[in-house]
């Protein structure tokens, strides 16, 4: 079936699921190699794992800009295709490529010029600073891979081809996972590079994944092509991309700020607490990847059918989305409730970390249902062209409510009960996101 016909005619439930499953698998694999990185780094030392956790806040900011730009581009391309304007879609895709390349250049310069200063801002400990600098500089200087890989995947997703999007990510992930132990520990004649080796393995995997995604677009994407000949830059395309993309960038960047701030709060408790939060965050991201895959799939479905004025299909997508997400949330909660010690054990957790980490994982897991609803509401609203719902929901759950509550509870009730701050933030964010998305659906689904 032609990609455009599939988005317009295929029954919504199977359409959403067939698009979502490859995305879920690709995101799970992407998250898995982040976890594999941490598992190998943890075998170096808990200090190395703490350094990787501190740097993750900066990596997350970089990913935020790339993903946000790609989400905005994806939504715009889907609407243009739904409006039967393929030439405008191709022009927007070319503009998106220039935006990604420009952003990559900025982060490369930051890595070359400011890695020492960033490491100093993350921690006062000299050993941690050195490890942070080694890990961060490689990821920043060679960031081209993650931006171009994200770009290529979103072009494929915009026409409904989530399978090739998944394959490109799998290629990069497999390369990364194979290279990790070789470069970290010095296997097969490669010098042992420690935490720097983990970073090098990551960027090589990203660059190869990017090459695969761009190649698939060149030979397999039947609709969207980058065209430099007769290309005319239009600020309106940039505005349309960032109307949805900027709130998503802010939303993702909020996660970076949250990670940085929580690490700062937890450093006052112990370095083990920082290492634990880094582990939790990656485990939670792994379990949430099916939800993000479902959310990414709904953007082109909603965007295309909203653009083609098929409001009944937009409403059907909403009716399928949340119940499916709830199932994933309950499964994730069950895993965290039943196997917290085993999950932490994957990362060579110390006795100190296990003492507060096991109850912490159980406390936080209860909030997954509310988090899933908030996340999916944000994706759905983005498909309708409104990225603000996503941004405000993220701000409430990760910044505005969470940080002051966590800071207060640590000082008044100690580390063991501080994790109840997640309950407060997730419930408030969920209530807002449901209200705002239903309002958007009423206004645009008429």
What are these regions (language model features)?
Residues 61-64, 176-181, 210-214, 286-289, ...:
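Hydrophobic transmembrane alpha-helices of multi-pass small-molecule transporters
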Residues 28, 32-50, 119-126, 182-193, ...:
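Helix-terminus/linker motif at the lipid-water interface of multi-pass membrane proteins
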């Amino acid at each position: 079936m032609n990609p455009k016909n599939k988005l317009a005619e295929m029954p919504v439930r199977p359409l959403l699921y067939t698009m979502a499953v490859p995305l879920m698998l690709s995101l799970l694999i992407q998250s898995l190699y982040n976890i594999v990185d941490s598992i190998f780094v943890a075998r170096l030392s808990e200090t190395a794992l703490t350094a990787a956790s501190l740097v993750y806040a900066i990596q997350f900011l970089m990913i935020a800009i790339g993903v946000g730009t790609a989400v905005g581009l994806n939504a715009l391309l889907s609407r243009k295709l739904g409006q039967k304007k393929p030439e405008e879609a191709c022009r927007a895709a070319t503009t998106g490529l220039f935006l990604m390349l420009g952003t990559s250049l900025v982060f490369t310069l930051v890595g070359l010029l400011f890695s020492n200063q960033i490491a100093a801002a993350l921690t006062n400990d000299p050993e941690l600073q050195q490890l942070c600098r080694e890990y961060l500089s490689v990821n920043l200087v060679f960031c081209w891979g993650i931006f171009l890989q994200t770009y290529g995947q979103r072009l494929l997703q915009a026409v409904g081809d989530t399978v090739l999007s998944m394959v490109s990510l799998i290629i990069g992930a497999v390369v990364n996972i194979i290279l990790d132990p070789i470069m970290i520990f010095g296997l097969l004649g490669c010098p042992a590079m420690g935490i720097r080796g983990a970073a090098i393995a990551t960027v090589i995997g990203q660059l190869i994944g990017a090459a695969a995604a761009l190649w698939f677009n060149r030979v397999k994407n039947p609709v969207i092509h980058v065209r430099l000949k007769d290309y005319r830059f239009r600020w309106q395309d940039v505005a349309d991309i960032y109307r949805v993309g900027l709130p998503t960038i802010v939303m993702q960047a909020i996660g970076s700020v949250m990670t940085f701030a929580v690490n700062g709060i937890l450093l006052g408790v112990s370095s083990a607490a920082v290492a634990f939060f880094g582990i939790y965050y990656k485990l939670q991201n792994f379990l949430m990847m099916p939800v993000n895959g479902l959310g990414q799939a709904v953007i082109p479905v909603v965007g295309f059918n909203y653009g083609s004025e098929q409001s009944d299909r937009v409403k059907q997508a909403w009716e399928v989305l949340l119940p499916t997400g709830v199932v994933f949330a309950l499964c994730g909660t069950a895993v965290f409730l039943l196997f917290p010690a085993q999950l932490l054990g994957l990362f060579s957790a110390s006795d100190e970390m296990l003492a507060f980490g096991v109850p912490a994982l159980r406390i936080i897991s209860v909030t997954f249902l509310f988090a899933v609803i908030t996340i999916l509401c944000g994706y759905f609203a983005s498909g309708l062209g409104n990225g603000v719902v996503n941004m405000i929901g993220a701000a409430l759950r990760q910044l505005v409510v969470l940080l002051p509550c966590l800071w207060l509870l640590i000082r008044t009730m100690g580390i063991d009960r501080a994790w109840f701050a997640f309950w407060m933030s997730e419930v408030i964010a969920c209530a807002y996101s449901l209200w705002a998305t239903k309002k958007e659906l009423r206004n645009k689904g008429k």
